[in-house]
């Protein structure tokens, strides 16, 4: 994490109000707004959208907020939250401009909220975090502000800091369902599944008729390697709402992780058949193509990804097109051919002018990362150095934590390719949520004699259960290796829930 972020985020976690006697009952602050009809229909419509947004029902939230924006065009927060939730790049830019134009005329709270969330969207992280801290200090008992801060920190993979804020949100309102959901994920991402399941039980009890709690429970069970129970909860979500697409995708991804690839492809087809947009359908087709990687049929996977890239291009989904070509570059063993796929990915990104900055920059960073690694593997040190230089400039310009980890992982993997193992270790240790970096770190640990660390990391990597291409390329092969190693077989069985 960039040093400036550390200090700013720690400010967010400091006490922001005087301690109160335990016997005094306090009420959470009501969220003030600048809308003229804040006590009437407009307020109710905004709150309905906010509740839907917090519980991952983005389309319902957007429907409420778009209606409100037409009714109350001078309500700044509705424009801000539309820009934050929409997947339409043009709408995102337009609504963000509307919110910023109204910012000078609104309350302190609304102004700080606009500074924070617009700063995040525009990758101006230092002023954004400063505004977030001011909000938390000025409105310490506003559960929505505390929750949104925790949610955003979680999205930046700052799980321990996020957990503290989300715990505070649940203390302000023990019935705050969305906070329990996000808190459960924070626990799960740090490996604390016991507390994750406890928080998830609270979440599902609070919203028994909502599909999202069952979907979240399923995902966390899957992260823990409990695939069968995960499938059961995904199916419960679909029983509540047969149109809840994330659970249909979750079923497909779970079968893929289980190694039941043909079944997974059938489930991806179901998801694609119910897709609301062509770009969404292409995304499912990309995931389906990855099942052939797990079956060790790379040519079939490459052919399907090439088709998906063409479809994405026709649908003007440049980011998906770039992702498909980058996936092809990852799968391709020949370095020269891999670099050609990366050229196509870069060309697609050049056409993605309407894509929000954070998403575009992260995809560009991943392309540069892989380019540097493949050039180093091909013995082209100067080319690798140039790619790393471009990646470093990108992460220094934006100060994003995800970009910083991508740079660290790229630097470490290039050093491993150059057999500079001791130098690689500290870089790779900054990117230990990426299976490719974890694999290279195991190699580096082994080469420098840190075999105990290598063994521990092998077990952690074997328990990685995210449905990504990186996982498909690394984890199944590692599990096979561990299963053949007598002294590690027992650990693997425990990790896979076989005992």
What are these model-predicted stretches?
Residues 71, 102-105, 138-139, 171-172, ...:
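Structural marker of alpha-solenoid helical repeat scaffolds
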Residues 42, 76-77, 107-109, 143-144, ...:
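Helix-start (N-cap) detector for alpha-helical repeat units in TPR-like alpha-solenoids
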Residues 17-166, 172-178, 185, 190, ...:
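Acidic, proline/glycine-rich low-complexity intrinsically disordered segments
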Residues 53-54, 87, 120, 154, ...:
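Position-specific recognition of the canonical hydrophobic site in helix A of tetratricopeptide repeat
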Residues 50, 84, 117, 151, ...:
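Residue-level recognition of tetratricopeptide repeat
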């Amino acid at each position: 994490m960039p040093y400036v972020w550390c200090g700013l985020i720690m400010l967010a976690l400091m006490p922001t109000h005087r301690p109160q006697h335990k016997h005094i009952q306090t009420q959470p602050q009501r969220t003030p707004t600048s809308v003229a009809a804040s006590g009437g229909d407009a307020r109710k419509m905004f709150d309905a959208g906010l509740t839907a947004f917090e519980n991952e029902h983005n389309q319902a939230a957007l429907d409420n907020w778009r209606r409100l924006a037409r009714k109350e065009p001078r309500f700044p927060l509705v424009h801000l939250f539309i820009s934050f939730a929409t997947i339409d790049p043009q709408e995102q830019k337009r609504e963000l401009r509307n919110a910023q134009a109204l910012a000078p005329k609104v309350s302190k709270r609304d102004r700080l909220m606009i500074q924070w969330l617009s700063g995040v969207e525009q990758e101006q992280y230092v002023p954004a975090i400063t505004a977030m801290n001011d909000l938390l200090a000025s409105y310490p008992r506003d559960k929505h502000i505390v929750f949104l801060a925790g949610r955003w920190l979680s999205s930046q993979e700052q799980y321990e800091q996020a957990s503290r804020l989300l715990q505070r949100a649940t203390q302000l309102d023990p019935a705050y369902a969305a906070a329990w959901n996000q808190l459960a994920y924070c626990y799960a991402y740090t490996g604390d599944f016991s507390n994750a399941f406890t928080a998830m039980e609270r979440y599902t009890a609070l919203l028994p008729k909502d599909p999202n709690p069952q979907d979240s429970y399923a995902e966390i069970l899957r992260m823990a390697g409990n695939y069968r129970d995960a499938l059961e909860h995904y199916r419960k979500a679909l029983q509540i709402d047969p149109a809840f697409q994330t659970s249909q995708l979750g079923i497909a991804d779970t079968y893929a992780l289980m190694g039941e690839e043909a079944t997974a492809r059938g489930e991806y087809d179901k998801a694609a058949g119910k897709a609301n947009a062509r770009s969404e359908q292409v995304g499912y087709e990309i995931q389906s193509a990855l099942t052939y990687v797990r079956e060790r049929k790379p040519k079939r996977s490459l052919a399907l990804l090439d088709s998906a890239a063409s479809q994405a291009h026709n649908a003007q989904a440049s980011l998906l097109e770039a992702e498909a070509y980058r996936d092809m570059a990852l799968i391709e063993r020949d370095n020269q051919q891999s670099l050609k796929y990366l050229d196509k990915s870069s060309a697609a990104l050049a056409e993605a002018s309407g894509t929000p900055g954070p998403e575009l920059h992260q995809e560009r960073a991943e392309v540069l990362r892989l380019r540097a690694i493949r050039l180093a593997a091909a013995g082209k040190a100067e080319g690798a150095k140039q790619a790393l230089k471009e990646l470093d400039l990108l992460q220094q310009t934006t100060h994003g934590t995800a970009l910083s980890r991508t740079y660290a992982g790229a630097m470490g993997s290039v050093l491993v390719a150059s057999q500079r193992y001791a130098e690689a270790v500290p870089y790779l240790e900054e990117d230990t949520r990426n299976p490719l970096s974890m694999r290279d770190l195991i190699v580096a640990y082994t080469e420098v004699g840190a075999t105990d660390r290598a063994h521990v990391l092998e077990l952690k990597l074997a328990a990685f259960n995210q449905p990504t291409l990186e996982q498909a390329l690394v984890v199944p092969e590692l599990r096979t290796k561990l299963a053949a190693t007598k002294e590690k077989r027992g650990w693997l069985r425990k990790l896979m829930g076989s005992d």
